[in-house]
Amino acid sequence: MRGSTAMLLAAIALFSSQSFATAIGKSRTLRSFEELEERQLASGSGSNNGLDDVKRSALVELLGEKVVAGGPTSILKAMMKLSDEELQNFIDKNIGSDSDSASGGN
């Protein structure tokens, strides 16, 4: 039983570390927020992840120009340092505002 559990945990750890390494590798190749947007538009995947719903100016207001200019990795690191309340306020204020206004929420 212990052997099976250890094998399962090892498999999960290996899968997680490979996925994490792949994500880090991809984010290191991005140099700016604009480059991320260009890649998303070129691949047609921009509408799949919610980043299109957030204006760059909103990120600059929340995190600062220097962080946003640092690209996706620095944006994610900075957002991970925010409190749950700050993140929720940002989400409520900026994400999905188009659907809110269409339904009369704004």
Swiss-Prot record:
What the record says about family reads: Belongs to the RxLR effector family.
About its domains, the entry says: The RxLR-dEER motif acts to carry the protein into the host cell cytoplasm through binding to cell surface phosphatidylinositol-3-phosphate.
Protein known as: Secreted RxLR effector protein 18
Organism from which the protein derives: Plasmopara viticola (Downy mildew of grapevine)
Keywords, ordered alphabetically: Secreted, Signal, Virulence
Expression induction per the record is: Expression is up-regulated at the earlier infection stages.
- Point out the signal peptide segment: 1-17
User: Key word rRNA-binding present in the record?
Assistant: no
Q: In which residues does the motif RxLR-dEER occur?
A: 28-39
Subcellular location, principal: secreted
- Report the function annotation for this chain: Effector that may act as a suppressor of cell death to interrupt plant immunity. I.
